[in-house]
Amino acid sequence: MKRLIAGAIAAGLLAAATPAVAQEKLTVFWGKGFYKAEDDALFAAVKKFEEKTKVKVDISQYSPQEMIPKTVAALDSGTPPDVAYGDVFDFQVAGKWAFEGKLEDISDIINPIKGQFEPNALATAFLYSDKTKKKAYYAFPTKQQTMHIQYWIDMLGQAGFKETDIPKTWKEYWTFWCDKVQPAYRKASGSRIFAIGHPMGVDSSDSFYSFLTFMDAYNVKLVDDNGKLLVDDPKVKQGLISAVTDYTDIYTRGCTPPSSTNWKDPDNNVAFHNKTSILTHNATISIVSKWVDDSKNATLTQEQRDQAAKNVKENIATAGFPNKPDGKPMVYRAAVKVGVIFADSKNKARGKEFVKFMMDEENLTPYVEGALGRWFPVTKKAQDSKFWLEDRHKKAVHDQFKAGTVPFEFTKNYKFTILNNENVWAKAINRVVNEKVPVDKAVDEMIARIKQVAG
């Protein structure tokens, strides 16, 4: 008996000394949403994956400005996440990382389901690796965005104008807001608001997306379909001069807050929500989606929820840009948001499993729609969902995308991700408004940098 007891005690001590088998972990870096519903949609998908696989997802969320530095730091330290998604990866790093051989080829995930996606979404994820000397799917597409204009209908009314008074032509449109609406509203309200929240910060993706839209208004093409630069064409230079002139003119006329030269991505939203600006151009409808989220937020008072609902239904308009200076309708560039798996990730097998799970229509669509219209789907089926016809804001987004979009330069020449990361566009804008450099000189500097980087 003593021997049995001693054996049992020894076995117990051995068991106590042996650590429990650790739960398998997947490390994920993911961009933080702009409001609660967006993050809740992500967490719901993560929880579903955890329940299915019994794998713990260790998720770290970062703002657009933090996401790339945090990911680069992890890469440099030799501990990259197993999966990473950032709202500006497509603009600034995915093409460069693929070229440098830092990304895992995930064609085995994308190829079997690529018929579900629209072509532009696939083009953004189909990247060239200088290591393999070929293109492959080195990223996974999740959702997309394009440029919209949003304005306060009630503030426009307080200034004494109706929506039908808004011009449809380019020059007249901006003049209307700056020279008519702004002074009229200031006089009527006694408050020093600004007509336009105009992003110009170098540390902002909004600023270069907005500027490139002004560039598109002048039909400027910086690269051909093979990625060859076209900036030596005198027409391209003149178009850039016109775009920079128009973009900086809004600032020099005192039509946007002085602080907008330093704005980061959320700041034009904040100015709009605070009603210190009447209009802003934004590359998603996150502005109205924030009020949709507030209208359903149980932590707010009923009065606050009712006001949020009224803002969505009555007070905020979602619209497209005016016609281009040549009189033709604006053609919008779409940016497809992508995530990646790194070649040096420690748990690539589970990382691929997570990506495959997220790419499944029944998981991807609720995640995208959970952002309440901030992002538009990249799958054909989800684009035809009744969700996009539920209100006038989402319908406006739906109609813009269905009218056709064009891709960014970086889908043809990956080195434009470097130029976007530097934000040569906002640097030129700030040279003009802060350093009083002539527009043509700022454009010459911009062109020289484009040729140096992407030539």
Indicate where each model-derived feature is located.
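Hinge/lid segment of periplasmic solute-binding proteins
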Residues: F89-H148, S207, N219, R305-F321, ...
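Short, solvent-exposed loop/beta-turn-alpha elements that line the ligand-binding surface or hinge
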Residues: D105-N120, I166, Y185-R186, F194-V202, ...
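Extracytoplasmic "Venus flytrap"
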Residues: L26-F43, Q145, S205, N413-T417
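Extracytoplasmic "Venus flytrap"/periplasmic binding protein-like
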Residues: E24-T27, A44-T124, G157-G160, D165-K168, ...
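Extracytoplasmic/periplasmic solute-binding protein
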Residues: S129-T142, M147, W174-L230
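Glycine-centered hinge/linker elements that transmit conformational signals in sensory
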Residues: W174-K180, D225-T261, A317, F321
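Extracytoplasmic/periplasmic substrate-recognition and gating elements
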Residues: Q23-E24, K47, K52, S77, ...
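C-terminal capping/gating helix-and-loop segments adjacent to ligand/active sites or protein-protein/ligand interfaces
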Residues: T132, Y332-R333, R374-P377, K395-A454
